Amino acid sequence: MDASLEKKIADPTLAEMGKNLKEAMKMLEDSQRRTEEENGKKLLSGDIPGPLQGSGQDMVSILQLVQNLMHGDEDEQPQSTRIQNIGEQGHISLLGHSLGAYISTLDKEKLRKLTTRILSDTTLWLCRIFRYENGCAYFHEEEREGLAKICRLAIHSRYEDFVVDGFNVLYNRKPVLYLSAAARPGLGQYLCNQLGLPFPCLCRVPCNTVFGSQHQMDVAFLEKLIKDDIERGKLPLLLVANAGTAAVGHTDKIGRLKEVCEQYGIWLHVEGVNLATLALGYVSSSVLAATKCDSMTLTPGPWLGLPAVPAVTLYKHDDPALTLVSGLTSNKPADKLRALPLWLSLQYLGLDGIVERIKHACQLSQRLQESLKKVNHIKILVEDELSSPVVVFRFFQELPGSDPGLNAIPAPSAAASAVGRERHSCDALNRWLGEQLKQLVPMSGLTVMDLEVEGTCVRFSPLMTAAVLGTRGEDVDQLVACVQSKLPVLTCTLQLREEFKQEVEATAGLLYVDDPNWPGIGVVRYEHANDDKSSLKLDPEGEKIHAGLLKKLNELESDLTFKMGPEYKSMKSCIYIGMASDDIDISELVETIAVTAREIEEDSRLLENMTEVVRKGIQEAQVQLQKANEERLLEEGVLRQIPVVGSVLNWFSPVQASQKGRTFNLTAGSLESTEHTYVYKVQGSGVTPPQTPTGTRTKQRLPGQKPFKRSLRGSDAISETSSVGHIEDLEKMEQSSGGQEASEANSHERHPEAPAPPEAEPPGALQDGAQGLQDDRPQVEEPESLR
């Protein structure tokens, strides 16, 4: 086009201009096109998250992001989390998930054969290891999912028309699911939500109250419930028994429960941590009876320390169609591949490795049981001391005159308030003990739980934690040592609680706060003058006083810990006093709190009123100074106020009057004249500031004795001679101080005209003078012969 343009236009200058214009227009168009494309990309990528924009990220950046998400930011405070011990068996289990994703890419025929082999092998191995003959297996991620599928299977088995008529069949004859009162929390609600059943279909079977363990299902009461449901036209469908309850690891009487279920045609399902002991050579009869049940749920992941391993539900049923409808079996290869991590891990561990891990956990629990039996003030809640793999213990304190056998449950004749107070005190202390042990021995895997009857307890379940955390026998010994080291603190604190309550209630201005969740000596609140006792709202003035009180108490550097927080039932601030590790003088502690809080309140009132006092004083001073200035004008006259004339008059006749000043005394809150300051060249006030209020009792402490400690006169920590020496020094100090006070009093009472005694006299003269004063007789001069 450029050549044709040059041919048509003969003028070279005009042709050059056309060429340049064309290039310029092309540049502008290209620039506009690029701008529109970039704007279009921005609009398109504005809704796309940052990590997805662009052409993607490399693997290193992605793994770095995952690491940051796992471990958190560096600025965050590190939390004490349990680190799972992932060994080679753990890597094998994790490899199973990646290998399963790779296997799923095979062709259908190879995938079907491989998944069938993996599923059949794993099912056979688990049935042989845990003595469950001729069983089928269902692998699931959620532990409760297997039980929900079993309930569906039981419904299909008992209601033949359920597939056709659906829930209309259930409406005519409602099914009943029986769960123990010691079952895991939320299990019944989960089953009803999964099955679409109303909550009245659940029946909670109570535990024993008179004979046997209080965490075992009451079989006689169960039979009564079943008979009542049958009479009401209901269908007893399924019973969930425990081989190791979720709380304390107790096992139900599975043998008797199996007989009851066979009698009434009820499906028996067993779950619990004690099922792991079926792999051992010796198994208790109560757990061995679980092999005759209709189904059971196993959790080999925690038992063997295998991460990301599914739970397994073993069951016995002959109709494959019903199991398929219930969801226990599936034709999808992906569902069968759930068993791959467990299939790899079981082969890696072998039978010896599996038995060794379960046996090691049981030995740890037995070791802890035997050690805690020798520790005083520790009660062990164990069903069977020979085979129980779960240890539950709690701290207790025997009441004076009580039966040692009734450690956890107070006597029925005791008052309800005393029983509740004792229960809450022990619960708070056990909660503190459990948290301390978890921090000191993190490899133990302890958990703190609240039981309905026993209260707060500490649970050691090595079957669920030992393989994961790598717990050893040395960790158990360290745990026992930590328990023994905390017992003096617990016993001392519990003994001082009642004394602290009595002292606080007897002290004016202090209010004892009953907080059942506080494990320390107690909680106290100072009631200031403007405190509204009926209000539960936040009190700013009280919060300020308690904040100052907390600061003063912490400055004493005692062995006690003090904290400030809201009251248990309101938002008012309180002082929380922590655990006592030694014998504490409660009366001195309470008195110190009361006196210090009163001083802080008075100081705060003084500061609040200071602004108003100073303002009024300044106004009064201004008025007085203005009056003084007017009086000066009247005395000097008007002529002296004229600049030139006043200077001449002042030179011939100087003014003798002095300037009257005023000073404001903050201590007295009054105006005073400055004449005393300028005439006598002395600054000061005749008003003596008030003394700082102190406690009514002043306690002499021995050297090195911390605040709030009782007297060490009877202590074995100090030698007899040293303690006697310290006591004599204290008595001498008291006598000397008392003698000085007496001499000062006598000197003030003496007549002002009486001559002062000489500076130095012989001892005899002093004695004669003292005798003369005592007899109140005139002194007669001795003859020279007697001198």
Swiss-Prot record:
Composition bias, Basic and acidic residues: 29-41, 774-787
Polar residues compositional bias, start-end: 685-697, 735-745
InterPro entries per record: GrpII_AminoAcid_Decarb, PDXDC1-like_2nd, PDXDC1-like_3rd, PyrdxlP-dep_de-COase, PyrdxlP-dep_Trfase, PyrdxlP-dep_Trfase_major
Pfam families xrefs: PDXDC1-like_cen, PDXDC1-like_cen2, Pyridoxal_deC
Single GO molecular function: carboxy-lyase activity
Entry cofactors: pyridoxal 5'-phosphate
Region span, Disordered: 29-52, 683-787
EC number: 4.1.1.-
Phosphothreonine: modified positions: T688, T692
Family designation: Belongs to the group II decarboxylase family.
PANTHER family in alphabetical order: PTHR42735, PYRIDOXAL-DEPENDENT DECARBOXYLASE DOMAIN-CONTAINING PROTEIN 1-RELATED
Protein name: Pyridoxal-dependent decarboxylase domain-containing protein 1
Organism: Bos taurus
Gene behind the chain: PDXDC1
